[in-house]
Amino acid sequence: MDKVTDNSPDVESTESTEGSFPTVGVDTGDTITATLATGTENVGGGGGAFGGASESSAAIHATAKWSTAQLKKHQAEQAARAAAAEAALAKAKSQRDALTQRLKDIVNDALRANAARSPSVTDLAHANNMAMQAEAERLRLAKAEQKAREEAEAAEKALREAERQRDEIARQQAETAHLLAMAEAAEAEKNRQDSLDEEHRAVEVAEKKLAEAKAELAKAESDVQSKQAIVSRVAGELENAQKSVDVKVTGFPGWRDVQKKLERQLQDKKNEYSSVTNALNSAVSIRDAKKTDVQNAEIKLKEAKDALEKSQVKDSVDTMVGFYQYITEQYGEKYSRIAQDLAEKAKGSKFSSVDEALAAFEKYKNVLDKKISKVDRDAIFNALESVNYDELSKNLTKISKSLKITSRVSFLYDVGSDFKNAIETGNWRPLFVTLEKSAVDVGVAKIVALMFSFIVGVPLGFWGIAIVTGIVSSYIGDDELNKLNELLGI
């Protein structure tokens, strides 16, 4: 009898290690292996180092306390793991497809072998030997088919595991992105809070507490209304139960039992009415307490706002005191008195038309031009060229408060630009038109606030200040211009 040799290709299968990336590799030749590449440790989740069903609550709480920098680093690491998982998934699909095709090929070989088995003269002569060879071939093919099927099923399982791990990484990435967004929002709010002074923070806290108190009051009010409806319903039911007891129908068998049942129902309804009434009274007490909380919160908010206003008034007063002191130190006490006089007269004053103010200023400027050299003019232009509008806006806000007006910071840039162009070209009308637009609501005080902001925030020099005060004076009257002329010796 011929020796039967199993020539089926060797098919190796390496068991999956929990917590690893599933990968595949189809070797050259007839050997096909299914392997697992070790994944990154401690990624999160249960069921393995790489991650199972979900991250533990402790890990999530710990991650929630990370800074934005830590979360961003963690996010980058997760992105790398996600890329590795996608690569592993692609390899697993390739492995599954290769092994599935291998199974199909083996099955087809078996089918062809069975189909080709027809008796011949030689086969009949060696029937016993051929039967044994045929059985050996059948067993070999059956064994190879079973082995290929098991490997194909293992590859399919590895593919499912790779997909699960990919989805788990995606879930973890979404969680990290959510935590990062919350951390960034918290940091932004902290930075905003840190930029506020104590009085502003007190107002914010009081506003928040008032909003919370109002929300609690609304909730309590809703509870009272709900319980009032219940009391109203039970009161109607109690009235009907009382009527049923009061109407006594006798003379039929068992009427006493019916009467007792009605009396029990009446007592039950009385007990229920007492219970819901007590609940309503309790809800009303809570509602009234919440009303008191709202009133107290409103008082606290008013106190905080009053403290803020006092602080702002003090700040604005300090600003103006510092402003006049600066003018005194730089240009003398007389100049400081003129500035104070301009500020005082500007309060509540209505301004002249652009043409009137410009005509008054031109007379003053024509004389002033003879005093200002090109070097002085260039210095004023350069100072206006390098204005820090952030600092200028702070000065405007403080000066405006001291004059009890509000000013739009956006006008500062327009005034600065027109002022600079006027120094360069000698055309002052655009500046006066801009000043008129800015002051249309509150009058000359707005012009004073705008122009005084430039005195504080821009190193204009003596002649630059003379121009600024001349512009302001032209809106107030000839008396102020005459004082300036006398002071400047023109």
From Swiss-Prot:
PROSITE patterns: CHANNEL_COLICIN (PS00276). Residues 146-170 have a biased composition (Basic and acidic residues). The keyword Cell wall biogenesis/degradation does not apply. Residues 1-29, 146-171 are annotated as: Disordered. It holds the Pfam family Colicin. GO terms for molecular function: pore-forming activity. GO terms for biological process: defense response to Gram-negative bacterium; killing of cells of another organism. The chain crosses the membrane at residues 447-467. It comes from the Bacteria. Residues 1-20 have a biased composition (Polar residues). Keywords: Antibiotic, Antimicrobial, Bacteriocin, Host membrane, Membrane, Plasmid, Transmembrane, Transmembrane helix. Gene3D superfamilies: Colicin, Helix Hairpins. One of its GO terms (cellular component) is host cell membrane. Disulfide bonds: none annotated. It is found in: Host membrane. Belongs to the channel forming colicin family. This colicin is a channel-forming colicin. This class of transmembrane toxins depolarize the cytoplasmic membrane, leading to dissipation of cellular energy. This is Colicin-5.
